[in-house]
Amino acid sequence: MSKIIGIDLGTTNSAVAVLEGTESKIIANPEGNRTTPSVVSFKNGEIIVGDAAKRQAVTNPDTVISIKSKMGTSEKVSANGKEYTPQEISAMILQYLKGYAEDYLGEKVTKAVITVPAYFNDAQRQATKDAGKIAGLEVERIVNEPTAAALAYGLDKTDKEEKILVFDLGGGTFDVSILELGDGVFDVLSTAGDNKLGGDDFDQKIIDHLVAEFKKENGIDLSTDKMAMQRLKDAAEKAKKDLSGVTSTQISLPFITAGEAGPLHLEMTLTRAKFDDLTRDLVERTKVPVRQALSDAGLSLSEIDEVILVGGSTRIPAVVEAVKAETGKEPNKSVNPDEVVAMGAAIQGGVITGDVKDVVLLDVTPLSLGIETMGGVFTKLIDRNTTIPTSKSQVFSTAADNQPAVDIHVLQGERPMAADNKTLGRFQLTDIPAAPRGIPQIEVTFDIDKNGIVSVKAKDLGTQKEQTIVIQSNSGLTDEEIDRMMKDAEANAEADKKRKEEVDLRNEVDQAIFATEKTIKETEGKGFDAERDAAQAALDDLKKAQEDNNLDDMKTKLEALNEKAQGLAVKLYEQAAAAQQAQEGAEGAQATGNAGDDVVDGEFTEK
């Protein structure tokens, strides 16, 4: 069975891992980095992903960041003169990860386990699955990020029973999950979180502070300058990371803008104490889900054996201190917070292929599911933290006499009134026989699969007529749209491949021309006229093909030049080797002669 890769599709950074033997291994990207920025930019028709895209974010307005925060919404982003759905942008990131995983493995990759925040709702999960499909991946499983982290942490501890709290603060989302580990079973007891809290918010606090201070000093509002704001974002992210290791950092942005007197520079010192003060409310917000998860699991702090930190934002000292204060425990630092989620996803891939045995993952649904009933009330059918997959049915009836149809309004959330919860979808069961209110028996069944994706069925028990939908939110894509996007993605991948091959060829041609010209110059007057003339002719042919911009001709002429240049290089090498041998022979003869000169006659007198 082919490998199933594990992907952590993050807000700020993403990572890909694969199971090798019994160990999960992070695959480095083409730049040698173990995580890849979740950044996509467009330039001259080319799609650029990762480190290269992030580097040009300041100067390229067609750059998209933090797209994960828009997953599951109908919001689109404009770039490259087009509008893209969040699924399409995410697919570009997934395609890039898939591509370099294939280069590493030396084989095609078609299957993946992709992680999502535990608190992602159905629409966000479905959007993630769609993104995988557009990228040419069969998504074998959607796994909650804290659960994946627990898998990576606990795989070698299956003989030990313990309860762990996973504190996952990423770039844009925050989750807390409590799991019970023992005998190879990873049982999620509860999960809680905040999908609007992450490292981006900490960056924004620094940005707001810098904008306010600069305005106070110079009377200019930088928030209206798009390029200045991108520079501020990069500086804020760097300052945040610096302050995890030092107590003070210098922010220096020369020529940030221009005033009446000329260019203006931003120079500011940010201390860790000031950063902690700016972000105090964000750190406080992390405490509520911790308490909620403990309460839902029915556990006290003393029953938690280990606290695992996941996500780059858990490196912030104030966050670490808050976790210590809230749990009363020193966090376990045996896992890399940036890599552990992808590693866990790869392990889940191994469970699916059968390479990892005796491991069972029992995950939960993060939010309650139900329907709207009379009076706009939210009636729950499946409570949050129910182990999935699961199915639950309940019988309802009509609200009016001779009602011919019922509207099923499917919701997800915890609020008592339907209007305050997230609408997942609506559908209608029709042709209900005329009867007084309360008589028809309408059975509503909710099914949640192993990926946390919901389907709902309504059945008239009198006529046995039923209607089923797999929930598709307002932001959902139709099969036709996904197919079109898949074709676009494949076409882009092919175009990108051709473009890369073209660039590689041009680089090879430039290198060959430079090297051959150098060799021809070095061999001047050394008696290789025939070889030099042949190399020069091949060189002229290649230069002509380069001028004509004929790629096929360039490829042919490059091969011809390499052959002629190699012949010339061999002659040069042979001559150099012969000269070396001659020199060594001369030195040897001289040494022998000198040895004879050193012999002198001696006179001895007997006593």
Curated annotation (Swiss-Prot):
<dbReference type="GO" id="GO:0051082">
    <property type="term" value="F:unfolded protein binding"/>
</dbReference>
<keyword id="KW-0547">Nucleotide-binding</keyword>
<dbReference type="InterPro" id="IPR029048">
    <property type="entry name" value="HSP70_C_sf"/>
</dbReference>
<keyword id="KW-0597">Phosphoprotein</keyword>
<dbReference type="GO" id="GO:0140662">
    <property type="term" value="F:ATP-dependent protein folding chaperone"/>
</dbReference>
<comment type="function">
    <text>Acts as a chaperone.</text>
</comment>
<feature type="compositionally biased region" description="Low complexity">
    <location>
        <begin position="581"/>
        <end position="591"/>
    </location>
</feature>
<dbReference type="InterPro" id="IPR018181">
    <property type="entry name" value="Heat_shock_70_CS"/>
</dbReference>
<dbReference type="InterPro" id="IPR029047">
    <property type="entry name" value="HSP70_peptide-bd_sf"/>
</dbReference>
<keyword id="KW-0143">Chaperone</keyword>
<dbReference type="InterPro" id="IPR043129">
    <property type="entry name" value="ATPase_NBD"/>
</dbReference>
<feature type="compositionally biased region" description="Acidic residues">
    <location>
        <begin position="598"/>
        <end position="607"/>
    </location>
</feature>
<dbReference type="InterPro" id="IPR012725">
    <property type="entry name" value="Chaperone_DnaK"/>
</dbReference>
<dbReference type="GO" id="GO:0005524">
    <property type="term" value="F:ATP binding"/>
</dbReference>
<dbReference type="Pfam" id="PF00012">
    <property type="entry name" value="HSP70"/>
</dbReference>
<feature type="region of interest" description="Disordered">
    <location>
        <begin position="581"/>
        <end position="607"/>
    </location>
</feature>
<protein>
    <recommendedName>
        <fullName>Chaperone protein DnaK</fullName>
    </recommendedName>
</protein>
<keyword id="KW-0346">Stress response</keyword>
<comment type="similarity">
    <text>Belongs to the heat shock protein 70 family.</text>
</comment>
<dbReference type="InterPro" id="IPR013126">
    <property type="entry name" value="Hsp_70_fam"/>
</dbReference>
<keyword id="KW-0067">ATP-binding</keyword>
<feature type="modified residue" description="Phosphothreonine; by autocatalysis">
    <location>
        <position position="173"/>
    </location>
</feature>
